[in-house]
């Protein structure tokens, strides 16, 4: 059951004018097909040109691994749609980029903590003697790989991790270190090239899960950076072909897994942290907001005559410029209009009021009405304060900070205990409300890998919560959020994309996402 009476924030119209509603973004439909490929894969024009810094998904949840009570897991995925056979270079991250995970622990839309990842690729230039010549090999490996920094690796990828307190650029910075060795450099496993190169990839990857000491935190955490199977599930082809599916299918709960997951054969690169909640919260406030971003140097010079070596074809310099941003899933994907997608990726949560028109008057319900030939199916309770409450400020009594400033962040109440995987409702809080259950630990209270954010968002954006709210504002989503404002009626509670997130393979422990698919299987 909900832990408190749900109610929308006071002055919610003003709140709408100050922030971006993330959740109305999550309807998986779009009029343009050239920039969308999953939760946030290739979602903006510029980011399609720099896939190494393209954030695809962000997760933040209370760890449900046995023995990890009170720990928070943060996962940022980058570099989308990796083919398992994508050699010979595979998918290293960009040494000229800055990858960050931000935490807002007082609800002001600004980061108070930032975890910064920087990568370095070191080429060995392994060579073979051919006749009387020493000739470098064309591969990143020369034989079997079993351990970090194996002698057979021709390219070693390492990273450093810093924690910044305060502003991400001007705050106090300190190095996160390996709790076992005391070193500040970590090894990233090579991608899953195939079974002949790496016979037991799960065992090899597990050697790259490191215990860490975080300055200012009294309890050790964990870090893992490496390739994983893409955990997102969606029926892309059908959806972006103007939702080429009968309403009878996407409104039938018996058919929630009737369509193929079109990215089931793809990998991503994961940046994962597990940190005790006491190191993330501030004072008595138990709700934290989180998001990930990636930045590039402002200037890039391409060398017409690159020297021998690794990645010598360009030079980068100048200030960091943010080019990717992701908190709530699907926001830039399908809510922000095409002219503002690059602008959104460069923005910060505290400035989200500039995207007002995409929030209070969302286009997606109207688009769905058109492509499904259901005239007038969009909810009529404009402005959509039910969505503002649920996804922008957080739900009062669940994941709304006491002094919240509306902003597009994933919000998590660290005081709500994790629910074991088998008992998790795949529809998160929305499913919990509809089922009158006791799982308040799921999306949009954070996001777990099992949470079906596509289906949750379809229900919410098409008015399902207003059906549940009733004429008496039972759940506190606002008096205008009532059944008569929902043309689809009870059908809005049953919408889905015909791909079940709950059947995606996952691990029961950190880093939770499944091992990547190999180049040979």
Identify the residue ranges that each predicted region occupies.
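Surface-exposed extracytoplasmic segments
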Residues: 36-521
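C-terminal segment of classical bacterial N-terminal signal peptides
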Residues: 27-36
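Sec-dependent N-terminal signal peptides
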Residues: 13-27
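N-terminal secretory signal peptides that target proteins for export/translocation
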Residues: 1-16
């Amino acid at each position: 059951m909900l832990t408190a009476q749900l109610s929308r924030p006071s002055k919610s119209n003003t709140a709408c004018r100050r922030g971006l509603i993330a959740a109305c973004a999550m309807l998986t439909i779009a009029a343009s097909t050239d920039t969308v490929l999953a939760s946030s894969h290739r979602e903006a024009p510029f980011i399609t040109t720099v896939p190494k810094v393209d954030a695809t998904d962000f997760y933040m949840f209370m760890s449900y691994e046995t023995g990890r009570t009170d720990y928070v897991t943060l996962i940022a995925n980058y570099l989308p749609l990796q083919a398992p056979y994508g050699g010979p270079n595979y998918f290293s991250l960009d040494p000229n980029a800055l990858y960050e995970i931000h935490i807002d622990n007082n609800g002001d839309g600004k980061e108070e903590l930032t975890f910064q990842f920087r990568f370095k690729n070191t080429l060995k230039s392994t060579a073979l003697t051919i006749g009387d010549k020493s000739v470098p090999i064309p591969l990143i490996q020369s034989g079997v790989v079993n351990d970090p920094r194996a002698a057979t690796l021709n390219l070693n990828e390492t990273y450093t991790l810093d924690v910044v307190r305060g502003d991400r650029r001007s705050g106090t910075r300190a190095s996160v270190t390996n709790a076992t060795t005391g070193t500040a450099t970590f090894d990233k496993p090579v991608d899953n090239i195939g079974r002949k190169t790496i016979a037991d990839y799960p065992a090899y990857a597990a050697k790259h899960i490191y215990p860490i000491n975080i300055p200012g935190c009294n309890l050790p955490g964990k870090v893992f950076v490496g390739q994983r199977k893409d955990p997102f599930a969606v029926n892309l082809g059908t959806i972006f072909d103007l939702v080429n599916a009968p309403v009878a299918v996407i409104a039938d709960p018996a058919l929630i897994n009737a369509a193929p997951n079109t990215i089931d054969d793809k990998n991503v690169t994961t940046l994962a942290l597990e940190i005790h909640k006491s190191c993330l919260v501030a004072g008595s406030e138990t709700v934290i907001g989180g998001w990930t971003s990636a930045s590039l140097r402002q200037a890039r010079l391409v060398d017409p005559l690159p020297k021998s070596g690794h990645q010598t074809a360009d030079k980068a310099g100048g200030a960091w410029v943010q080019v990717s941003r992701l908190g709530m899933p699907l926001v830039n994907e399908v809510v922000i209009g095409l002219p503002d997608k690059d602008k959104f990726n460069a923005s910060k949560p505290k400035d989200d009021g500039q995207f007002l028109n995409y929030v209070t008057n969302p286009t997606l319900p109207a688009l769905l009405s058109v492509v499904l030939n259901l005239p007038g199916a969009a909810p009529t309770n404009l402005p959509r304060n039910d969505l503002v409450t649920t996804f922008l400020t957080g739900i009062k009594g669940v994941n709304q900070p006491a002094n919240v400033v509306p902003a597009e962040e994933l919000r998590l109440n660290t005081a709500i205990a994790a629910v074991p995987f088998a008992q998790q409702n795949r529809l998160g809080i929305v499913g919990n409300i509809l089922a009158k259950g006791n799982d308040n630990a799921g999306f949009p209270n954070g996001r777990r890998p099992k949470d079906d954010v596509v289906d949750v968002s379809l229900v919410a954006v098409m008015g399902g919560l207003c059906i549940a709210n009733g004429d008496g504002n039972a759940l506190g989503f606002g008096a205008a959020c009532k059944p008569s404002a929902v043309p689809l009626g009870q059908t809005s509670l049953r919408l889905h994309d015909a791909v079940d997130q709950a059947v995606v393979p996952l691990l029961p422990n950190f880093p939770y996402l499944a091992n990547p698919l190999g180049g040979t299987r």
